Amino acid sequence: MEAIKRVRLSEIAELITKGTTPTTLGYNFQEDGVNFLKIECFSEDGTYIKEKTAHISEECHEKLKRSKLRTGDILFSIAGAIGRVAVVTEEMLPANTNQALAIIRVTRDDIYLPYIKLILTSQIVKAQFERKKQGVAQLNISLKDINELEIPLPEKSKQIECASLLEKISGIITARQKQLQKLDDLVKARFIELFGEPLSNQKGWQTMSIVEAAPIKSQRGDLADEVWLLNLDAVEAQTGTVLFKHRVQSGEINASTVYFTAESVLYSKLRPYLNKVVMPDEDGVATSEMIPMYPLADRLNRAYLCYWLRSDAFVRHISEKVAGAKMPRVSMDYFRSLAIEMPPLELQEQFAAFVEQIDKSKVAVQKALDEAQLLFDSLMQKYFG
């Protein structure tokens, strides 16, 4: 097969830039106005979630002239949920964005935009970022990194052929991902049905200080010579799914980590809107951005605590209680002041059994998803080596 040339993204892009948070310039978000797009406005596959859109004034939009969006602009998340890719459409405009989304504007006639979007979501690009990670807890990508990305660029006819085939498989992957999302939504709906919205105590349950009901502690389990080290990039946003397990020798564990056991719930205080809450299935160590919580066995079920923390109501509330513009973290003083509803343990355990059944269904869907992803990756390998 004829070798396909590789180019840097900067060689084909008219513009690579990013936006700014309006509040840093003295502007506030408002009920309506110009659309302001953030990472949470897009699903994993880049689908636009209109109801998540924030809004800014026309004056603010003009002030943020550098990041005014156009139809066809590619948005690439460079902070938090790294590597989420979306293409700006007419329905999103007028619009602006913040510093967590890189804007990639490609206008050349010899380039097929759907092909570029596919390449940016592929292992070809992910592998380049993985090499830059170098053990940090939370990878952030700079505009320089985006400019330096190398991608294969065949003739336009080949781009169209490749994108057409891969989009079909990508459609299967998206369908499986939506199945998983529906199962997650089912669990959330069941939670609300049984317990009501967290923090509102609609059912009139007894409440308890969250740190009394689930003490925070770095508790060392029975660790082997090779230890599971959990960093935030291994946790899927919104679902808390552990994407992969990184193992290290126990002697390599540094001071900026916390120990946890399989009885804990791990809550990420960094960028709480990403909703990274994990129920670990074995002992290990984690980045200190994770808070290990240990629910009292006779009062609080682990699954109940986990989904209480994952609930939309809690995520919305806690996302406003952060400090730090570039690396927003939950205020731990505020977190410790929270009270959690304490339904009867029997009801919590009924919910946990429901979660367990849904998890079994998710395993089957995930298997089909993994097979489709494997096919996608093998075809990418066939096309580009």
Task: Identify the meaning behind each predicted range.
Residues V125-Q128, H317:
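Periplasmic-binding protein-like
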